[in-house]
Amino acid sequence: MTSSIVLKFFLIATLLVIANSLPACHNGQFLKINKGPNCDDAKYENPDYVIVGGGAAGSVLLDKCISYGYKCTLIERGIDYEDEQVVSQPSGSGLVQSSNAVLLTTTYPNSNIFNKTLVITEPNIIGGSTSINGEISVFTDIENFFEEISIPGWSYLDVLPYYLNVTNSVNRPSHQGAVDVTNTLVTDPKYVAFKAAIQQVFPNIHEKLPDMNTASLNGGFPGYGPPETSVKTSFIPIGDTQVPVSGFRESAYRAYIHPIRNHPNVRIMLRSRVDKVAFDKCGETAKKVFVTYQNYQGSDSQCELKAKKGIILSAGALRTPQILMQSGVGPADHLNELGIPVVSDMPDVGQHLDDHPTVVRTFLGIIPDSSISANIDGHAYWNHLDDPNKVPNWSIQISGFYGPNFKNILNVYMDQMSRGWIKLRSTDPADTPIFNLGHFSDLEDVGPASLGFNKTNQVISNLQYIPIPGLTDVVCPSFIPNCQSNLTEYYMAAYYQFGYSGYHYTGTCAFEKVVDPNTGLVYGFDNLYVVDASVFPKAPRGNTQIGTYAISAKLADIIFGCQ
């Protein structure tokens, strides 16, 4: 063997050793992977709190935890933010869906819609859904919403300060939140075209200026207006106009985690899945979490991690109930079927899954989109009865794509009665649960959804977009042969062909069913908390991102401020 060959083998072996020791646990300084089966590296030993999940909720919790002076370890299943550069691009939402930042799952067949299945897109990156979503930042119909759920301590006036303190908007200068948002300019030709199309169909609803969020604070959520997006944009003045010159996605990671990643009380474990929570003999105190972590070579190891004060599950409405059920907290019948010892029989864990049924059709636009914005050309919220005094139950959002100039038209039904559920597929935590979104399981939803869809089609025709074969036109399937002549059947055909999840999952660990809204504790436990969108009893009318930030901040003040 020549010396050059020996040298090559030596270099390859050295590179493999280095690669196998690449970090899976970061605090901004690339901490090395956990050693030992008990997470007994001094960097991770005995934090005050373990936070499971680094999405919108977990990011807020970590920031609040540090501000209250506690030592916290955040465990995140997904990859590092820097491992997938496309997530930073405001115009890259479409590209993200085919990247390593997402996990794709197929839902349980929907017997109400001819056994249709949907694709669920889950985040696989720190920052959670805020790193992969469409970047729409809307307060939603919070006044009506919190009045309807009617939980003491969670009125509109109780939560409003938290909503206001999430964002940093030029239109709300007295509130300097962590999440920078940018609103579409009213002079943007794409918004001008959207406004004209909306006004022709909905003469009774009003434009919300200077943006939807700010205007809605002064009364009445229904309307249309310049959308705010979670994009940090830089502008330069040209004459009297502010012209955007650069922008990046303002995810939960960038807003909350990145600024504190080097804090001495922060430890972050990436590529680390919490398999279950272990309890004391009485089944009342959460003692530790079992973690499976992965290095950059893909090798798995297991460890355990204890917390002095509490364990907070913030893995989202799809994964938090999975962890609870794997831990023996959930419907006893379901757990017994799988042979999981029941710690606490809680029938509502994984139930009441709410979402927004969405029909997405794609057209070719006329006005080009930008490479440095989220390209949300407009959004509107209304009641299908076209009454500005009625609570909105439908929305239309237009999402553009830089380059090919495609326009995704999102027709979103926001007030469904239907509910779904989540069940474990097996006792293996690596197995994706069974997700049943339950769209249209309550037939009362079909009528309003059909009428709302008809209205959005009128808006689309006014925009004069160009249809794209296979992506635009609704084709009547064999089992609905005359769908073109019936509004309800036409909507069902459109949903069957172009139906999607709204990705607005809530309800699976709901307040007053699973979680005490006064403490954030799972009922029956003294240090096991749930803080994420799963605690919403129903999906708010609109996107869930800002709402999740807000309720997480309120719960964080309750949890950390009362110790």
UniProtKB/Swiss-Prot annotation:
UniProt keyword annotations, A-Z: FAD, Flavoprotein, Oxidoreductase, Signal
GO molecular function: flavin adenine dinucleotide binding; oxidoreductase activity, acting on CH-OH group of donors
EC class (word): oxidoreductase
Residues bound to FAD: 48-77
Lineage: Viruses, Varidnaviria, Bamfordvirae, Nucleocytoviricota, Megaviricetes
Cofactor(s) it depends on: FAD
EC number: 1.-.-.-
Signal peptide coordinates: 1-21
Family statement: Belongs to the GMC oxidoreductase family.
A Pfam family matched in the record: GMC_oxred_N
Catalytic-site annotation from UniProt: 504
Keyword Signal included in the entry's annotation: yes
Organism superkingdom: Viruses
Official protein name in the record: Putative GMC-type oxidoreductase L128
